[in-house]
């Protein structure tokens, strides 16, 4: 395989590095100062300013391969750009290339309905809302996702969701509006990798309770955060199921 950078990638690297020098690095102290002196769990003014500048510079949504909504880059072409963005912890969000939104947006692009894309993907791509991903659970070793115990049960035209998740990345952000939830819809399936499904859950749905945000080595990652969330008899439309029951691992 040829790992040499294409002319397109080299040009983007140069533009991205210049943007980092001009706008990101000089604003790092301001970013952390705004977090420290204001409400830690509210978006900072400087980040919103940087996002608009990145859009104007054509350095927005650089991820999302094989989609007209992205920048037309393969993962191989996107990787060296991530290396540059990764030089400042605040940078990926400024380019709308931060986790878990990038992965969640790709899931919506690949497997969401047109209504999902209109309601959730479009504002995510525009940087107006954020998202979170809920898989890990406190009661089981979730590094092996076949262990998860949360339930997704069909009830007519709805699914009912119950369980407790933690380390739900992005849930602390007040702009977070949608959760991609992974749970078991068919726990008795002989194929352990067909027991799980992924489903969309609005964060303001009745029964979704954010219990606390969790620090990582003492760092709370405000205003993004990693939360412990309780799902108690949460009802969502059956149309919120992604790809189909039992296809959670296929999506992952």
Task: Please give the residue ranges for each predicted region.
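Short Ser/Thr-interspersed hydrophobic loop/turn segments at strand-loop and sheet-helix junctions
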Residues: 58, 81-87, 182-185, 200-206, ...
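A short, Trp-centered hydrophobic/proline-enriched beta-strand micro-motif
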Residues: 127-136, 181-182
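Amphipathic, small/basic residue-rich leader segments at the start of a protein or domain
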Residues: 1-99, 110, 115-126, 130
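Flexible, glycine-rich active-site loops centered on histidine and acidic residues
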Residues: 105-111, 133-134, 188
């Amino acid at each position: 395989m040829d790992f040499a950078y294409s002319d397109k990638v080299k040009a983007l690297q140069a533009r991205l590095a210049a943007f980092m020098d001009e706008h990101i690095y000089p604003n790092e102290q301001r970013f952390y100062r705004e977090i420290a002196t204001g409400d830690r769990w509210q978006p900072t003014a400087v980040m919103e300013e940087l996002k608009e500048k990145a859009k104007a510079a054509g350095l927005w949504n650089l991820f999302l391969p094989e989609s007209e909504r992205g920048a037309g880059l393969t993962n191989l072409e996107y990787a060296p750009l991530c290396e540059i963005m990764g030089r400042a912890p605040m940078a990926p969000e400024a380019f709308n290339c931060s986790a878990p939104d990038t992965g969640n947006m790709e899931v919506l692009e690949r497997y969401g309905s047109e209504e999902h894309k209109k309601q959730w993907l479009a504002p995510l791509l525009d940087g107006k809302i954020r998202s979170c991903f809920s898989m890990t659970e406190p009661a089981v070793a979730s590094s092996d996702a076949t262990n998860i115990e949360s339930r997704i049960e069909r009830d007519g035209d709805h699914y009912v969701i119950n369980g407790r998740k933690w380390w739900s990345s992005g849930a602390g952000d007040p702009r977070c509006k949608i959760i991609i939830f992974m749970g078991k819809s068919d726990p008795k399936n002989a194929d352990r990798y067909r027991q799980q499904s992924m489903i969309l859950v609005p964060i303001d749905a009745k029964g979704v309770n954010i219990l606390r945000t969790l620090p990582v080595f003492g760092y709370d990652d405000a205003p993004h955060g990693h939360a412990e969330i309780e799902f108690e008899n949460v009802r969502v439309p059956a149309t919120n199921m992604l790809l189909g029951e039992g296809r959670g691992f296929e999506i992952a």
